Every structure is written in structure tokens, then in C-alpha cells.
Amino acid sequence: MRLAVLVPVVVCSLALVGTAGASQLIARNASNISLQVNSNGKALITYRAGRRVTHLIAWGAINARPRPASPSGPRQVKLKLDYSGGWGPWRKLIWKHFKNACQPYDGPELAWFVTACRAPNGSYWALQSWQTALPDLGFVPWMKKQRTWWLHLSHWSGPLPQLEVYQDWVYSGRFQRIFGRYTYKGRGVRGFGTTHFGAPTDSYGRLVFVDTHNSVYGAGWMRENSFVSSGPPGLFCYGFYPFDPLVNGYAHPPGTTHRKRGPGTGDMYRLTATGPGVTPDVSWQGPGLHPYDPNNPSDVEHEHEMNAKLTEIKAGWHKCHAG
């Protein structure tokens, strides 16, 4: 779903440390990747990471649970993973005699696509890979782990999660902002809490990552920030402001000073959200806004329209105010 609309929204962003599990992280910097699924609902993922070839067996989860009423409820679904090719749980290397029954993929288009197929029962398995751990605020990665490409595995049937995105200006047009909602089967994707710096603390919380293109950070795509969707609507809002890299837990290279970075406004933005449960990661991409002109009737009208859209999305939720 691609929407590029404007509306005054309040910024409720936090620097985030770490990432939440989703789809499901199975490897880093993998190559020579293949996916097979048998008639018993088990997937075999073969890949090379460094000098090692791994035959991973995955099974036991599909889609995502709705968030329960309290944190004491059941945990979010999670695939079982055996990196020994079957020896661990079954005491035999089932990968050597694995009978693939998966058919060519005919499901919805996926972001960060590597490979996918349709299982005999009609469900889908997919692999996606993207640089999940890039540092925020447009820093060029200075550690190897920040440059890694994470390989995510998903298993689902039915609709994908939906990432609905709008744009507006805030503080009398001085800054740009992105807002919207992240939903799955009509319900907001949300957890029960975050750390002081905004990282999810439970298996239901999910992160939305924002990349900016051709910004003050440099040419091409750079990681701007990440945040959780919250509340019954699965609401999120993020303002492109200058940020002090030494405040709020941002990772930063040695020698970084308190000099603010940004605003990270660009000519395009890309949002990627990790899928709830073991559903696929989803992404949105669209052009950024031009500088706000209070004398331009079109800009003023867009602000009013987006104010109304934000109020509609919030549905009484207390975060993200028009501004």
C-alpha cells in the first residue's frame, strides 16, 4: 500500500537499541540460499555463511497470534529451528533425504525477496534479507555486525500485515513527519512495553525502520531511525528533527560529539516493518515532501486533510498529536 499524504502529526520517536524477533531471523550474511518444504510441514533451508554450509530445519508455527489482554497470556508464535539438519530432534540427518513438495511461489509481492514457495497445504514459506542492524542517524557502519544482511524466514497463509503511511509537516512547517498505522488482520500490531530507549520488551512488539534517501547524511539510502507501533490502532509517528547522537541511546562511532545530526529529510523514504509472529516483513517507499509554504493553498489543504486522517487513525489513542 503506497500513500503519500500530508498531515500535522506529533513526533513520538525514540532511539532504539536492539531489534525484536519477527518473521524470524535465522542467519546473517547468508549466500547460496535454497528453500524446500515437505508434505509434513517442515522447511529445509540450505545456505552458506562464511565457510560453513548449514542445513536448517524449521517447523511448528504459522501466521501470528493477536496480542492477548495481558502480558501473562501466551507468547507470540515462533518457529522451531534445528541447525543440525535433523540430528538434534530426530537423531537422523533428514536433510539428506528431504522430499521437497513445495510449488513455485504465486503469493503476494514481498519486499527484500530472496526466495519463496507454496507448500502442499496452500500456505507460503519465504526468505527475505535486508540490513536490519544499520546504525541510526545516518552513521556509516563502523562495526562489521552493523553491515550484516539478516536472513528472515516466514510462514503464513491469508493476508499480509499492512503498513499504511502518510506524511505531513509539523512546527509550522519547519519539519517533515511520517505517520500511519501497522495492522495485521485489522488489528494494530503492538506489544506491551518498551525499554527506556524504545526497544520492544516482549514477543508482540515490532519495530518499524525508516531509511532516508539523498539526505544530509549523504547520497543513497541511510538508516534514519526505528520505532514501535503502539496502541489499538498500531499507530506510529516520526518527525525528522535534528538529534543529538549522544542522547537517548543511539549507537555512535568513537569520537562522536554532541553536535546534532540531521534533520534526515530526503527525496525518498522507505519504511520496513518486521512481521508479527512469523509473517513476512513488509515495506513502503515513497517520495518525501517539499518545503512547506503557508501561502500555498494546496499545502494548507493537505495539512487539514492529514489532521483529519490522523484523528481518524488514532481513534482516541493518546499518542501522536496534530501539530
What is each PLM-predicted segment?
Residues 21-323:
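Extracellular, repeat-based ectodomains that mediate carbohydrate processing or recognition
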Residues 17-19:
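N-terminal signal peptide c-region/cleavage motif recognized by signal peptidases
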Residues 4-15:
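Bacterial N-terminal signal peptides
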